[in-house]
Each structure stands twice: as C-alpha cells, then as structure tokens.
From Swiss-Prot:
Keyword field: Amino-acid biosynthesis, Cytoplasm, Isomerase, Methionine biosynthesis, Nucleus
GO annotation, biological process: L-methionine salvage from methylthioadenosine
Homology family: Belongs to the eIF-2B alpha/beta/delta subunits family. MtnA subfamily.
Source organism of this protein record: Arthroderma otae (strain ATCC MYA-4605 / CBS 113480)
Reactions performed catalytically: 5-(methylsulfanyl)-alpha-D-ribose 1-phosphate = 5-(methylsulfanyl)-D-ribulose 1-phosphate
Name of the protein in question: Methylthioribose-1-phosphate isomerase
Length: 385
C-alpha cells in the first residue's frame, strides 16, 4: 500500500502531519482555506507539489461546505472576488514554491473565464473551481509516474555505470516522494522507476538538516517500499562521492522553483551537492514537473528565499528512546535544545543552484538538456519555439 500525504474526497480533506512522521501517523482535517494556510506554513505538509494541492483543495472544501449549506452568494462577481482573495492569501503561506502560485494563477484564470460564459451564478464558478482543483490532484500523481520513467531512462543512458549495463547508485536530498506530492514522487519517483526496471543498485539519502526531511520522511518511504538504501548526514556527501566502490551514477533532487535559465531553488544544501557532483564527475539532475518551472522569472537571483525560525536549527523533536516500539497513542514526542544558548542563527529554507551545475532537468513530458552553447531552453517543454 502506497503512502499518502493527502486524503481527499469531495467535502473531506485530511493531511498527514509530517512533523510527526515517522514516529506517529496522524492526519489533520482541513476544512477551510485558513486551515490549509496554517498546515502549509507550519510545515505539517511540505514538498512543492503537495503544498499546491493542499492549498487549492482546502479552498475546494470551503466552497463545497458553503454550497452544501446554501451560504454561497448567488452573485458571480462576489464569488469570483471571494475565490481570488482566498487564492492570494494561500500563496503567502510558502512564497518560494512556485507550484502554489502557478496553481493559483491557473485557477484564477479558469474562474474568470467561466464568468464570461453565459449568465453564470455564484455556484457555477464554485463548481468549476472544485472540479479543476480535483483534476490537479489526479494529474499530479499521473505526471509523477511519467517523470520517474523519463529520469530513470536518462540515468541509465547517460552515465558511465548505466552505459556499462550495471545497476546504478543514486543520492537524493530532502523528501521528494509520495509525502511531497500527490503520489509516487519526483526525484524519489525516479528512484522508484529505477527499482521497477531492475536498474537500481542502492539509494542514499541525506538527513537534510535542519528539518531532517531526509532522515524522517525519505528514509521512511525507502523502508516502507523496501528499497535498498542508506542514510547519511549532510556532511558525509563528499566522502560518499569519493568512494570509488559506491557506484554512484547521479545525484537526483527535486525543486521548489526552476526559473527560465535553469537556476533551481531547492532545499538548503542542494547547491553544495551540485558543486560536489561537478568535482567528482557525477551527474546532477533536477526532477520536477512543469508546474515547478517559472518562465516569468529569468534568473535565480530573483527568487525570494524564505527564512525560517531560529528554533528549527537549535532544537530537535523526536520520541523518547523508551517509547520506540510502543503503540502510537503511547508515544511521547519531546523537543530538546541542541545548540549553545544565545548563539545567533541563520536559517534559509532554500538555496539556488546555478544552471551550469545541472546536467538535466527531468519533467513529465521529457528531459531538458543544455544546448551547444551550454544553455537550457526550458520554453520548449511548453511547446514554445
């Protein structure tokens, strides 16, 4: 049974509380856009694709509730303004992840176009929104399977280990699997596709400080799916790449935003992995759906980088050792301080990897590689010349 970060049916949305995974599997009910904003901002849900889906579905639940109780305005103008205002609000929850703003723009456009058809009532606009949001959930899972297959094929065909017909080793960072998407995953989806085609030798995942998404979430998924894998600390990556016997063919990461020239914002620590990959001759691959590509932003220096609370670096949360193996209801999670009191902290959530350190950008429609001039032409992924 696959892991689910999002449980949805019309009128019901539940989000897996990823702050408690892997020790406790608890789902948080979400019934309004405000509740959606908070589960995203407080990182109960994370991963750019999952953030977008939870955001748009939270408003879907709110609109469905209003329609069911006949509290929705009958005026199309009022419902249009209501939806647009809520979408703008939801986008503020995590500004770096472009998937959310992309989904909001698409849904705004849909609602505005629906208002121009015939003489719609407020309910017509709300129903159009709900149907479109639900389709985004379905499409994301399907796109991830295609993306995973494209990425796996590229690694096999474009790395020395793969060309020799050997199984490949892959290193990944943060969490990009079923818990970060509607299902299957992006970078972790590539690893799943390698395993499915019997091309995976071993997967490695970084712990991904300071939030430990790799140690808590990616490791959880790898164990759940019985994928051969090893956890390393972030500072061990260079030593791993230097091990000739490791058989590492590629580093595969996800993305929160890929801009027009290919510069990529992703979880803090991604940039240093790209530098290490370049030095050691290991392919560095970004795996992300087209919803993560932001052609409106030209270069990485224009990306807004979210900075988070100092306490995320100075404290850590987990169960007491004595509680391990107990039933979930008997597990107590405790937070302890791990840093010297009074020390200053810098805590950017993301960094930007320059395009020239990236070998390929894998999407659900194919793989983008640099041209003879060393430049990505990402607009071609959207059918532009």
């Amino acid at each position: 049974m696959s892991l689910q970060s999002i449980r949805y049916k019309r009128g019901m949305l539940q989000v897996l509380d990823q702050l408690q995974v892997p020790h406790v599997e608890r789902y948080i009910p979400v019934s309004t856009a405000k509740e959606g904003w908070h589960v995203i901002k407080e990182m109960h849900v994370r991963g750019a694709p999952a953030i977008a889906i939870v955001a748009v579905l939270s408003l879907s639940i709110e609109l469905t509730e209003l329609m069911d109780h006949e509290k929705l305005s009958t005026e199309a103008d009022e419902v249009e303004a209501y939806i647009l205002e809520k979408l703008d609000y939801l986008v503020t929850s995590r500004p770096t992840a472009v998937n959310l703003s992309d989904a909001a723009i698409k849904l705004k456009t849909l609602v505005q176009k629906r208002k121009q058809i015939g003489d719609p009532k407020g309910k017509d606009l709300a129903e159009a929104y709900v149907e479109a949001a639900e389709k985004m959930l379905i499409d994301d899972a399907m796109d991830n399977h295609r993306l995973g297959d494209f990425g796996a094929t590229w690694i096999v065909n474009n790395t020395p280990v793969g060309k020799e017909g050997k199984k490949v080793g892959v290193l990944t960072h943060c969490n990009t699997g079923s818990l970060a998407t509607a299902g299957y995953g992006t970078a972790l989806g590539v690893i799943r596709s390698l395993l499915a085609s019997d091309k995976l030798e071993h997967a490695y995942c970084t712990e991904t400080r300071p939030y430990n998404q790799g140690a808590r979430l990616t490791a959880f998924e790898l164990v759940h799916d019985k994928i051969p894998a090893t956890l390393i600390t972030d500072s061990m990556a260079a030593s791993l790449l230097a091990q000739k016997g490791a058989g590492l063919a590629a580093i595969v990461v996800g993305a929160d935003r890929v801009v027009a020239n290919g510069d990529t914002a992703n979880k803090i620590g991604t940039y240093q992995l790209a530098v290490l990959a370049k030095y050691h001759g290991v392919k560095f691959i970004v795996a992300a759906p087209r919803t993560t590509i932001d052609l409106r932003t030209k270069e990485g220096e224009d990306i807004i980088i979210e900075e988070r609370a100092k306490s995320e670096v100075t404290r850590i949360t987990g169960p007491r050792i004595s509680d391990l193996g107990k039933n979930e209801e008997n597990i107590t999670l405790e937070t302890v301080n791990i840093a010297a009191p009074g020390i200053d902290v810098w805590n950017p959530a993301f960094d930007v990897t320059p395009y020239d350190l990236i070998d390929a950008i894998v999407t659900e429609v194919g793989v983008a590689e640099k041209n003879a001039d060393g430049l990505f032409q990402l607009e071609k992924l959207f059918g532009f010349p």
